Amino acid sequence: MIFDKEDFESFDPELWAAIHAEEIRQQQNIELIASENIVSKAVMAAQGSVLTNKYAEGYPGKRYYGGTEAVDVVENLAIERAKELFGAKFANVQPHSGSQANAAAYMALIQPGDTVLGMDLNAGGHLTHGASVNFSGKTYHFVPYGVNSETELLDYDEILKIAKQVQPKLIVAGASAYSRLIDFAKFREIADSVGAKLMVDMAHIAGLVATGAHPNPLPYADVVTTTTHKTLRGPRGGMILTNDEALAKKINSAIFPGTQGGPLEHVIAAKAVAFKEALDPEFTTYIEQVIKNTQAMAEEFAKVEGLRLIAGGSDNHLLNLKVLDLGINGKEAQDLLDSVHITLNKEAIPDETLSPFKTSGVRIGAAAITSRGFKEVEAKKVAQLVSEALVNHDNQEKLAEVRKAALELTRQFPL
């Protein structure tokens, strides 16, 4: 059976109600989660296409199934657009997620038990950069590096010192909650000084890299992994890039048959759409506005007594705030703001003292609100509303005012 919208609603009203509720939530909430964005109708159309019916194990021209002529075209379009977008010689667009892209990259680069340097979770790293609860920390011997305790910036001299002490086979650069520029050339120097490979996870900053708003890691890294959503504004998925032909072959084998079976060609089609959108000059304008909006919010937060900008501000699409001095932890701040139609997430900060389920801070991103049409004026208003709620977290009258203002703002910028 093929359902249209009305048939779907009548066939499965419970599921339809949940989807509709999420649509309303997205319409009414100011979305500040840094890893989220709002995709185009074209991206959604591609992901919801008949390609979801097709199995296509293998790669274009080398499939284990017949009838793959059309999906070969789809996947090749995604590959060629990704290569053009990031200046890469090779691209694998099959990873189902950023985590699976990282898993395959590790498989291609190192062996189980090898020593790896990765950014500490509290400093802004990702679970797949060596967290003990993650496959990465269980499979490989990860040694963490952090940030300077005073500046909260990456300390490249300290990273070099750690690298010389532990002699890693691989160094992982990139983060999920680091608000400043990353110097990939320095990471390359450090890796070369100890004979290590360099892998860059640019999941959060891919959209910035694509437009030149952040240095491109491709000239320096052996392998680059990324997600295709976040600032790239595509479907949820992953990708691996390299300029090394031998590594490209290992990466392809690590994805299939190493860690995945059939690729999700409907998602790959949506990736191809997103890459084409990102190649358009309008996307550069969008990313420029994302950065302007982030900095506008940072300026407002800097005025609020009791709030502290981690690392002193932002060079990219996100910023981190310490909220604990306001008498509220990160989890409480997240829940409080959700109640007034503002969505963000709790976030650990450098030298964190609370558990990951509480945290001392929150993370804020501007990608989604910028996709919605917000500019600096609205971004400043958003920061003011967040601050008003956090400062007055026990004042129901003030919170009601914030809730009303947030709803009014989202009404002005419908999805």
Swiss-Prot record:
Where does the record place it? Cytoplasm
Alphabetically sorted, this entry's keywords are: Amino-acid biosynthesis, Cytoplasm, One-carbon metabolism, Pyridoxal phosphate, Transferase
Q: According to its UniProt record, which cofactors does this protein need?
A: pyridoxal 5'-phosphate
Point out the annotated site residues (description: Plays an important role in substrate specificity).
H229
Cite a single GO MF annotation. glycine hydroxymethyltransferase activity
N6-(pyridoxal phosphate)lysine carried by residues: K230
Catalyzed reaction equations? (6R)-5,10-methylene-5,6,7,8-tetrahydrofolate + glycine + H2O = (6S)-5,6,7,8-tetrahydrofolate + L-serine
What is the protein's major site of localization?
cytoplasm
Q: Does the keyword Lyase apply?
A: no
Q: What does the entry give for GO biological process? A: glycine biosynthetic process from serine; tetrahydrofolate interconversion
Supply the Pfam families for this chain: SHMT
Q: Which of the seven top EC classes does this enzyme belong to? A: transferase
Could you name the Gene Ontology cellular component terms for this entry?
cytosol
Q: Which residues bind (6S)-5,6,7,8-tetrahydrofolate?
A: L121, G125, H126, L127, S355, P356, F357
Q: What is its EC number?
A: 2.1.2.1
Which pathway does this polypeptide act in? One-carbon metabolism; tetrahydrofolate interconversion; Amino-acid biosynthesis; glycine biosynthesis; glycine from L-serine: step 1/1
Q: How does it assemble?
A: Homodimer.
Q: Which NCBIfam families match?
A: PRK00011.1
For this chain, the family text in UniProt reads: Belongs to the SHMT family.
User: Its function?
Assistant: Catalyzes the reversible interconversion of serine and glycine with tetrahydrofolate (THF) serving as the one-carbon carrier. This reaction serves as the major source of one-carbon groups required for the biosynthesis of purines, thymidylate, methionine, and other important biomolecules. Also exhibits THF-independent aldolase activity toward beta-hydroxyamino acids, producing glycine and aldehydes, via a retro-aldol mechanism.
**Record HAMAP family:** SHMT
Which PANTHER family does the record cross-reference, listed alphabetically? SERINE HYDROXYMETHYLTRANSFERASE (PTHR11680), SERINE HYDROXYMETHYLTRANSFERASE 1 (PTHR11680:SF35)
Can you name this protein? Serine hydroxymethyltransferase
Native source organism of the sequence: Lactococcus lactis subsp. lactis (strain IL1403) (Streptococcus lactis)
Task: Name the gene for this chain.
Answer: glyA
